[in-house]
Every structure is written in structure tokens, then in C-alpha cells.
Amino acid sequence: MSVPAELKYTESHEWVRLEADGSVTVGITQHAQELLGDMVFVQLPDVGRALAQREDCAVVESVKAASDIYAPLGGEVIAVNSEVETSPEKINEDCYAAWLFKLKPANAGEVDGLLDAGGYQKLLDSEAH
């Protein structure tokens, strides 16, 4: 299973990419999309919405289940990927390219609380047993 080393991760299976401008891009991990199966619906937060860390802010729905997506960091939504709303299957095709939304973090220090690739792999290994 792919766990890209350059990303950060949450225990609820979101990935976070730190951008050069200080913003973060958020999506769901390969593990999450494999558990959910074929995506059929995505609901994203509104641009401009202020989110608290771990607040449920989006929904992905598959043929198997609906799953809440949580904000990995507190901050303001500065962009959403409307392409995944119209074509949810893009998440299944490449979950690391098919991002969901971008945040301007309110507290950059919250990034330090996220898992690195090694920590996320350990989480996956523990869930498998």
C-alpha cells in the first residue's frame, strides 16, 4: 500500500501536503479509499469556512458507506476541488492527486501533531491485527 513519505497523515485516514505558501492540501488516503470502495458522491466544505481541528467538514460516499472527513488542522478553507464533486471516481483512480480541499492553517504548530509516513504505516499495521 502506498504511503508517500512527503505527506503527513491523521489517525482518521486523511493525508496532508504542506505547500510552499504555508497552506495545506487535504485528501483521503489509499487505505481509506480501498475500505470505502467505489466513490459515488463527495460533499466539500464551502470556501471561506473556518474549521476547528478534527471538525467534520466534508463527506465521501461510496457504494459501501458514507464517511465523514475531518479537518486535520484548524483554519480557513481557501479552495475546494470541485472536480471530485462532479467525478468522485477520481479519488479511486489516484487518491493522492484527487485532493479534496485546501486550508490556510490558523496554527501552523498543529502540523507537528500529525503522523509522518512511518507513524501512519504503524497505525495501518496495528489496525490490520
From Swiss-Prot:
* Any one Gene Ontology BP term: glycine decarboxylation via glycine cleavage system
Q: Could you tell me the keywords of this UniProt record?
A: Lipoyl
Q: Where is the Lipoyl-binding domain?
A: 23-104
List of residues that carry N6-lipoyllysine = 64
Name what cofactor the protein needs: (R)-lipoate
* Cited Gene3D superfamilies: 2.40.50.100
Q: Which GO terms describe its cellular component?
A: cytosol; glycine cleavage complex
Write out the function statement from the record: The glycine cleavage system catalyzes the degradation of glycine. The H protein shuttles the methylamine group of glycine from the P protein to the T protein.
Family per record: Belongs to the GcvH family.
Q: What is this protein called?
A: Glycine cleavage system H protein
The record lists the organism as Nitrosomonas europaea (strain ATCC 19718 / CIP 103999 / KCTC 2705 / NBRC 14298)
Gene this protein is translated from? gcvH
